[in-house]
Design a protein with these regions (language model features):
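Long, low-complexity intrinsically disordered regions enriched in Ser/Thr/Pro/Gly
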Residues: 62, 69-71, 89, 99, ...
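Short, solvent-exposed coil/turn segments at beta-strand boundaries
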Residues: 14-20, 39-41, 60-67, 115-120
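Blade-level signature of beta-propeller repeat domains, shared across WD40, Kelch, NHL, RCC1
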Residues: 106-143
Length: 143
């Protein structure tokens, strides 16, 4: 067992290939962001986002290039689903999902985006209909 990073806040990491992790972390609130972490060297590289705008989501990686993630509900109870292209430095919103106040704390429902093996479909959990359900849509990525 080896420590890779020793930040105060570490959250929602995912593999990017066999030697890199993409995660949301920082030493303090002002430094929170998405970072790329090398497993071999433990070096980090800050990625694209202003964390205050996109918040701590649940990232998944497609082809070591696209980060698909979500946000927590904003003050209007809207969660965003988005994709970020690491090569083009391009952000694109994929959807907005309302979550009523009846879903909060332990009953809240994060989107937890995940992609099908062939990258054609994107799956999310949502309560925008008033009940927790699994939804899917065409990903529009790598098609």
């Amino acid at each position: 067992v080896r420590v890779l990073i020793n930040e105060s806040i570490i959250s929602h990491c995912c593999w990017n290939g066999n030697d890199e992790i993409i995660g949301f972390f920082g030493a303090e609130i002002d430094s929170l962001n998405y970072y790329r972490l090398s497993i071999e060297s433990c070096n980090t590289e800050k990625l694209f986002f202003d964390a205050r705008k996109y918040s701590d989501g649940h990232p998944t990686i497609v082809h070591n290039r696209y980060i698909i993630s979500d946000t927590y509900p904003d003050k209007n109870r809207i969660k965003k689903l988005f994709v970020y292209d690491l090569v083009k430095n391009d952000y694109r919103e994929l959807g907005l999902f309302y979550e009523s106040m009846s879903f909060f704390s332990y009953s809240r429902c994060d989107l937890h985006p995940r992609i099908s093996v062939d990258n054609r479909f994107l799956f999310v959990d949502s309560v925008h209909s008033g009940k927790r359900k699994l939804y899917f849509m065409r990903s529009g990525i790598c098609e």
